[in-house]
């Protein structure tokens, strides 16, 4: 599974518009890799089967988006650990992988290159090969101070004295 995290300036756009831009870029990346992908609402599909799911929201003027692209996986293991959906109004989608659709799993490098090539122009941004040391340090501080705390992850009130 290739995970994608995007943080971008909102620029006045609504969430559905931003999600559609991201889904379209991911679908183009998947087509670069050799599969006939289509951007759907909050997903990318191939022949009606979901290969990528997206979710996101705004934090003030900033879009925070996450996506998971199924490159290759052990479907039997996935089926064994997931709880089946029993809601007839919202049946679980059929899923597929890039390996199944193009005959082999593309390398991580190929997937990242395709995603970067399609996402960068949409967001008018460069996509570096790695985070700068100061970005890594900031991410580690934020993880330790807030995002990685159990209370944040579990949606519980912060401990006394923690903001």
Task: Write out the residue ranges for each language-model feature.
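A glycine-rich, hydrophobic loop/mini-helix early in the fold
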Residues: 1-11
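Long, positively charged amphipathic alpha-helical accessory segments at protein N-termini or as interdomain linkers
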Residues: 9-38, 50, 57-163
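Structural motif
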Residues: 46-47
């Amino acid at each position: 599974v290739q995970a994608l995290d995007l943080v971008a300036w909102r620029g006045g756009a609504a969430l559905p518009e931003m999600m559609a831009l991201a889904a379209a870029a991911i679908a183009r990346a998947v087509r670069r890799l050799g599969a006939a992908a289509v951007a759907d609402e909050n997903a990318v599909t191939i022949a009606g089967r979901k290969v990528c799911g997206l979710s996101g929201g705004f934090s003030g003027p900033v879009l925070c988006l996450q996506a998971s692209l199924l490159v290759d996986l052990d479907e039997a293991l996935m089926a064994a650990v997931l709880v089946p959906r029993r809601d007839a109004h919202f049946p679980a989608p059929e899923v597929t992988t890039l390996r199944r659709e193009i005959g082999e799993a593309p390398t991580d490098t190929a997937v990242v290159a395709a995603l970067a090539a399609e996402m960068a122009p949409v967001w008018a941004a460069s996509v570096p090969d790695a985070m700068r040391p100061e970005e890594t340090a900031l991410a580690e501080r934020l993880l330790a101070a807030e995002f990685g705390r159990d209370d944040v992850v579990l949606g519980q009130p912060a401990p006394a004295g923690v903001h």
